[in-house]
Amino acid sequence: MIDTRVPITLLTGFLGAGKTTLLNSVLANNSTGRVAVIVNEFGEAGLDHDLIEKSSEEIVLMRSGCLCCSVRGDLSETISNLFRRKILGEISFERIVIETTGLADPGPIIQTLFVDLFLANNTRMDGIVTVVDAANGFSTLDSQFEAVSQAAIADLIILSKTDLVSHSKIKKLETRLQNLNSNVEIIHSIFGEGLNETLWGLSALHEKATKNQALDWTIGKHPKFEPLSNLSGFSPAKKLSLPTPSHDLRIGSASIILENPIPEAVFDIWLDTLIAIRGSDILRIKGILFIEGIDAPFVIHGVQHIFNPPVQLKNWNKGDQRSRIVIIARDLTRPELQRSLEMLRTHENE
């Protein structure tokens, strides 16, 4: 069965980080395909007028075939209206990009995509992209906890304006971002160029995802091998030691690899307990889960109290039945999160 849902990419980043430059690059590129970009306000979007074919009060059509619209009412209504006009043949699009305002917490937007029945049936989360200004990244992270949260839950971080700062400053900023989000891929971009294909297909929340895609999304493309990290009481080696800013201290993350499939009831009890106690502080949970008695694994993904329906991966090679689970949370320390995850290991062989 072909998954016909439209992929949605969430684009976050603070004012001045370079989101507009990136959007204009996407909208100008004829190889992008037909993309519908949703912005908060046209006046704030900074669209390049040389790229505009025609515009109305609600929609701007770009020369590349892409379109841009502003939020009218709530987000679910805006996306539903796009689909209605697509069905009527008025517009055409193959994917959606939602640009958040600088201060926006991405969590509620992701939850909307999960809980709205129409959106859940017609769209799927394709990835969270966060743009970080290399020139002002440190000061923004120091002053705005929302910026820290945006970096912590990203699937991909784009460092903009890297031509304006030294290599050593870039490396320090990368280290700080990786301390917040150890599995994230970080790439550099100047003026948003050459990124189009990199932005898409970040998530494994579809049944056609390959094993490598699922692993890249869950544990990162370049995980560092830590021989003791999968044993209780041992943590991965720390990266370059830097003073930890106060906002960063509020973010905790932990992961676990389980060698054997676990009972479904054990996972359900663990997750229900975690959500009941600290659900509002869970920024993101994602993972690959093997359940006893079922050959193919499930991809799981949730934000706070809300979770996607699990997606079973059909293209998983037999033999590897290890579950991988990652949690990112605020106001929970890494040891606290790790202790919670270790409850799954306790029942792994029951």
Map each language-model feature to its residues.
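Small/polar loops that bind or transfer phosphate-bearing groups
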Residues: 39, 71, 98, 161, ...
